[in-house]
Structure formats: structure tokens, C-alpha cells
Amino acid sequence: MTTVVAAVIERGGRVLVGQRKPGGQHPLKWEFPGGKVEAEEKPEAALVRELDEELGVKARIAGEITRYEFQYPGRARILLIFYRVVEFDGEPRNLDFEQLRWVAREELPQLDFLEGDVDFVREFVGRRKRLPHL
């Protein structure tokens, strides 16, 4: 099973999300920055690497938020792991997306997210009242 890691980066009450480019898989869908874990790589290390590649930042992972399995039609199951990133060196730059956007948490459901992220978005937005630090 492929493991995919994603970063929830919040600043000033907004969350950083990226929109995929039009020519690849799942064109123009929104997602949290991150990517696939390579063989023999730990998930946290993969996320640090992916954030450097996609955003040009050196991130410090604060902890895992949640994980679950998902299967896109006709594809193998994947394990999605979402991490909270509270600090990073550098200013996020768009090195890999069609566009980057800082979005208020309550506005996330209005974006056309990857199917694999939709349940997390609902859960994350619903947590605000119960767990304001996540």
C-alpha cells in the first residue's frame, strides 16, 4: 500500500492549500501540500522533503492529526496521513502547483478537493469548536 503524507499549515487563521496543474492526475483539484512516501523513508521525513520540493520551506512537523485508508476507483488503496506543521524556515513559494492559496478553515469545503481529502476537510472544519488548536 502506498503511503501519502499531507501538511496542514495554518497561519493567521488560514490554511495553505494548493491546486493541481491542469495536465496531470486529478487536474485542478485542491489538496494539502505533501506527497508519496518513498521506499525506506519515514512518513515525517517524506513530508519534510515534499514541503521543501513543493514550497521551498524547511518544515518542523508538530504531530499527526489523523490517518485513514482511501481507494480511488480502479486504483490500489492508499494510506493518507495528515500532519500539523507549526513552524517552517522560509516563506512558502509555489514550486509545484497551479496556484497556492491561504484559505480560512470554514471556506475549505467550498474548494474542489481531491476525493481522498474530502472526509478530512469535513472533519477538520468540524473540529474548530471542539479542538481550536487543530
Tell me the role of every PLM-derived stretch.
Residues 7-8, 22, 72, 91-94:
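Short secondary-structure boundary/capping segments
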Residues 14-53, 57:
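Conserved Nudix-box catalytic region and its N-terminal flanking loop in Nudix hydrolases
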Residues 1-16, 36:
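Conserved N-terminal beta-strand and adjoining loop/helix that marks the start
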Residues 2, 58-59, 68-91, 101, ...:
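Active-site-adjacent beta-strand/loop module that shapes the phosphate/pyrophosphate-binding cleft
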Residues 84, 93-124:
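NUDIX/MutT-family hydrolases
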Residues 125-134:
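Generic C-terminal helix-cap and adjacent flexible tail
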